[in-house]
A protein has these predicted regions:
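A composition-driven surface/loop motif
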Residues: 1-153
Length: 153
């Protein structure tokens, strides 16, 4: 079955926290097999996210972080001195904000691309009633049930 990466990752995370003691043996086996099938997708996704963050936090990012610290210090001084910022100071802060807005946008695009990528997973469907038993025992919300509904018959 093909699913979006984020769907597989969310399902893996939800399955990991389930208390399966009240489920039938067949349903418990299905949960275990699904964990096995979804784990590599989840681990690869987490690794990819780390790599994206590391890639984005390059030398330019470090320089901009330093500029942020300097701008914060400037804002503190301006407040202490009870004065208005100069136009040059305002431009510096606007430039920093614009750079980080573009940086965040690029990061979000990469992360969305990773999350939306389709992956093939071999999952075992199980009865919805069994899923509800596990969720009751695990004190989970229906929002979390929804993340696993695609695994049920």
């Amino acid at each position: 079955m093909k699913v979006k990466t984020i769907k597989a990752v969310e399902a893996y995370r939800a399955l990991k926290t389930l208390k399966v003691g009240g489920m039938s043996d067949d349903a418990m086996l299905a949960v275990w097999k699904n964990l096995k099938a979804l784990r590599p997708v989840s681990e690869a996704y987490d690794k990819d996210i780390e790599e994206v963050r590391a890639t984005l936090q390059d030398e330019e990012f470090e320089k901009m972080q330093q500029r942020v610290k300097e701008a914060q210090e400037l804002e503190r001084k301006v407040k202490e001195e009870d004065r208005d910022m100069t136009e040059a100071e305002k431009r510096e802060i606007a430039e920093i904000n614009a750079w980080f807005a573009a940086w965040n946008k690029k990061g979000e695009e990469y992360l969305k691309e990773l999350a939306e990528k389709e992956v093939k997973v071999d999952v075992v469907e199980f009865e919805a009633e069994e899923l509800l038993k596990a969720f009751k025992a695990s004190d989970k919300t229906f929002e979390e049930v929804e993340k696993l509904s695609w695994l049920t018959k």
